[in-house]
């Protein structure tokens, strides 16, 4: 469908082409300026920094993930689909048993990078008064006046979480390898 394709392209282009921090600011500060939204049920969600950050992260990672999956599906050789059809396998079964497993395997390294980037991107949530790891670090610094020690610990925690994600993705890559 050309309309859906244009919408998907535009969504991906906008969210991959603008910084995550700008997206968080537009959702948290910008949408609150729209008078109509303040009188709808959406305001219950949009007035909270937690939900605004979640929405921004979801829209951002959704754009990158859609591009990762698009490129993964494009790596599937048409001959594999034709082989399934020649054996009398339905298109639905070909999709679930041939295309999806190949696309998952192809997309894992890039998707692992996206997860790590999103994990590190959570530090931007502190800019909208949300107490994430970076926000807590800033608070501790304001009471202890020891920025180096606090940021080294915060960086170590991020590094450990990245280590866990990286090793989980590597395990899945080995599990799904041929």
Regions found by a protein language model. Give the residues of each.
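Transmembrane alpha-helices and adjacent helix-loop boundaries
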Residues: 1-178
């Amino acid at each position: 469908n050309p309309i859906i394709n244009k919408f998907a392209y535009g969504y991906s282009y906008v969210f991959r082409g603008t910084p995550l921090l700008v997206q968080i600011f537009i959702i948290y500060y910008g949408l609150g300026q729209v008078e109509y939204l303040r009188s709808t049920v959406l305001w219950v969600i949009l007035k909270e920094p937690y939900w605004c950050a979640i929405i921004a992260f979801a829209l951002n990672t959704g754009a990158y993930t859609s591009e990762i999956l698009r490129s993964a599906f494009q790596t599937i050789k048409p001959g594999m689909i034709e082989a399934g059809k020649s054996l009398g396998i339905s298109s639905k079964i070909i999709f679930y048993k041939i295309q999806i497993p190949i696309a998952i395997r192809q997309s894992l390294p890039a998707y692992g990078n996206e997860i790590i980037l999103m994990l590190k991107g959570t530090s931007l949530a502190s800019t909208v008064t949300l107490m994430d790891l970076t926000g807590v670090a800033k608070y501790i610094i304001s009471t202890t006046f020891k920025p180096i020690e606090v940021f080294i610990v915060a960086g170590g925690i991020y590094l450990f979480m990245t280590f866990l994600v990286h090793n989980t993705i590597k395990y899945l890559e080995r599990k799904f390898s041929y």
